[in-house]
């Protein structure tokens, strides 16, 4: 990718066609789709610029070359990254991609913690996401209507199917075609392979639990690179397990590796970094958004950018915070909030429940590389038969690996024999852990704190969310079922785990959804089926805030497809003169 410098601006008198707020997975896609359709677009990012390749300062660095051997100084982590350090991807190699919690706080009730994992820089969390990429199905889009939890989705799978294909081909998704109704097939590159233990487990599982099936997880890593990916400057995955540090090979999908170069190539994109969007500018005479108010993150100076369309892609809670802060006489509780549901129905996937254990045999088997995905069991609960204790469902994911030399840390020994022992691979282990659907509930909400402000003078976001009874019963079933499956598969010394909310608060699945949901009725939803605000027709929200429920699959691929579809609709509406 060419240098970003020529495309970065501060102030601009120009009226753009579209302002895109945010530069992560959805912001990158919006910039690509809009510029390729001929629109002059401004991408506004609150964080610093990050160049592809040279900006990945932790990439290719072995732990012993780092000042703290790959770990973050304990005092720094506690004082500045108390929340971010809970993320699996946070370490000395990646710290620069995570928010400083001391500088960018938020609030929660004292007895209801929420862990908000954030990455405010150009590229957002697309630089360190887990890359699991799954289509949703009508089982998910029809669930609210059928069981009465949440509002009916205004779209169905058929509305998104061509857009799933569109984004899959460009992003590059590795996976296998399985013919499962609960998990539709897509436009896939070859799947990664099972290791010997996983293959044996798959055969036993598929035979016992059909129609449920163990498949290889679908991931936005290039198992092979097509001509389209080569044209983006990307090559196949090197299986280094360093994805969250940034990848100079462009082997996994990110804004920097994929959508941003495509947008810049058009010549129609400009980027405003270190620009914190305070609010959306609204004209009550025309009932239109006319731009955004911005605070410079470095100088505290204020400025405005103007456009014909405003598209919020600032993350679920980021976009909702902007809308809540965009108050006027017409919208005293937040822009486009005539329904009163803005900020409500927050969800995050249910996690941290499962089981693992020791596998006997396979001493002569090993594996090559560090595959970026693993075995995956798509949803099987409440697909045909109704579970007596809870509604909706979950997936199980995991894998098999061999213990390494670190396992010898607690073993006795010394000298030549001890060294020889730790050179040998340890025992095989196999585990499965759940990811389930949290029900949308009005009381799970975010709001602006009435008195507390950040260092830029903006109200802190206040997050109040808890798991409900259905959520907890599902998590219990995740752990019980994972242990039951492992026992049938012959795994020994099984350890069942299920964390409490204090140990593993909501938010740590890093799949926040809802708070500006789409729906059919403007009285009960913020957006229509094209991610367009019911109240303000030239305002769009295409990130996780738009979701009417959270399903059980990782949501990023659906965010991409929705964004591409919304952009096409926005362009059509502009050309028709309706917005």
Where are these regions (language model features)?
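A glycine-rich dinucleotide-binding beta-alpha-beta segment and adjacent secondary-structure elements
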Residues: 215-223, 240-243, 272, 278-282, ...
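N-terminal Rossmann-like FAD-binding beta1-loop-alpha1 element of flavoenzymes
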Residues: 18-43
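FAD cofactor-binding and catalytic pocket of flavoenzymes
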Residues: 95-125, 129-130, 135, 148, ...
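Residue-level detector of alpha-helix initiation sites
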Residues: 20, 24-25, 196, 317, ...
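A conserved FAD-binding loop/helix module that cradles the flavin
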Residues: 549-567
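Conserved redox-cofactor binding core of oxidoreductases
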Residues: 67-100, 104-115, 120-121, 129-135, ...
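Glycine-rich loop(s) and the adjacent beta-strand/alpha-helix scaffold that form part
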Residues: 36, 40-70, 249, 266, ...
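A short, basic/flexible loop-to-alpha-helix module at the beginning of a structural domain
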Residues: 1-15
């Amino acid at each position: 990718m060419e240098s970003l410098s020529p495309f970065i601006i501060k102030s601009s008198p120009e009226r753009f066609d579209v302002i895109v707020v945010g530069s992560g997975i959805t912001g990158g896609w919006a910039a690509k789709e809009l510029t390729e359709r001929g629109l002059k677009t401004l991408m506004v990012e609150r964080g610093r610029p990050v160049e592809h390749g040279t900006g990945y300062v932790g990439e290719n660095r072995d732990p012993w070359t780092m000042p703290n051997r790959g770990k973050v100084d304990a005092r720094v982590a506690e004082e500045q990254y108390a929340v971010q350090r809970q993320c699996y991807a946070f370490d000395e190699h990646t710290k620069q991609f995570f928010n400083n919690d001391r500088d960018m706080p938020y609030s929660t009730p004292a007895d209801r913690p929420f862990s908000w994992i954030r990455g405010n820089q150009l590229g957002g969390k697309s630089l360190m996401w887990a890359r699991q990429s799954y289509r949703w199905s009508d089982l998910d889009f029809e669930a609210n209507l059928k069981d009465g939890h949440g509002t009916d989705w205004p779209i169905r799978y058929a509305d998104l199917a061509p857009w799933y294909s569109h984004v899959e081909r460009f992003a590059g998704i590795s996976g296998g075609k399985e013919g499962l109704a609960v998990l539709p097939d897509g436009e896939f590159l070859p799947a990664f392979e099972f290791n010997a233990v996983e293959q044996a487990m798959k055969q036993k599982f598929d035979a016992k639990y059909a129609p449920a099936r163990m498949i290889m997880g679908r991931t936005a890593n290039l198992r092979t690179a097509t001509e389209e990916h080569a044209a983006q400057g990307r090559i196949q995955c090197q299986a280094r397990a360093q994805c969250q540090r940034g990848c100079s090979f462009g082997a996994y999908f990110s804004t920097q590796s994929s959508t941003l170069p495509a947008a810049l190539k058009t010549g129609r994109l400009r980027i405003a970094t270190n620009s914190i969007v305070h609010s959306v500018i609204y004209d009550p005479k025309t009932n239109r958004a006319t731009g955004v108010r911005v605070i410079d993150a470095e100088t505290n100076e204020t400025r405005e950018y103007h456009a014909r369309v405003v598209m919020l892609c600032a993350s679920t809670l980021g976009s909702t915070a902007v809308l809540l802060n965009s108050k006027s006489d017409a919208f005293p509780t937040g822009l486009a909030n005539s329904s009163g549901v803005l900020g409500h129905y927050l969800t995050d996937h249910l996690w941290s429940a499962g089981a693992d254990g020791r596998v006997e045999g396979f001493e002569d088997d090993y594996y090559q590389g560090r595959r970026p995905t693993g075995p995956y069991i798509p949803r099987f609960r409440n697909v045909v038969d109704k579970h007596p204790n809870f509604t909706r469902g979950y997936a199980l994911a995991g894998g098999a690996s061999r213990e390494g030399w670190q396992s010898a840390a607690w073993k006795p020994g010394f000298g030549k024999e001890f060294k020889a022992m730790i050179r040998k691979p340890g025992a095989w282990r196999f585990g499965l852990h759940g990811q389930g659907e949290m029900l949308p509930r009005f009381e799970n909400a975010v709001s602006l704190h009435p008195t507390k402000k950040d260092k830029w003078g903006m109200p802190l976001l206040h997050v109040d969310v808890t798991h409900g009874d259905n959520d907890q019963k599902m998590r219990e079933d995740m752990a019980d079922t994972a242990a039951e499956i492992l026992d049938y598969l012959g795994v020994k010394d099984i350890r069942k785990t299920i964390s409490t909310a204090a140990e593993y608060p909501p938010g740590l699945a890093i799949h926040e959804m809802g708070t500006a949901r789409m729906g059919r009725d403007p009285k009960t939803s913020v957006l229509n089926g094209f991610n367009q605000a019911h109240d303000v027709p030239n305002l769009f929200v295409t990130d996780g805030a738009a979701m009417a429920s959270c399903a059980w699959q990782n949501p990023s691929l659906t965010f991409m497809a929705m964004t591409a579809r919304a952009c096409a609709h926005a362009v059509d509406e502009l050309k028709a003169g309706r917005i």
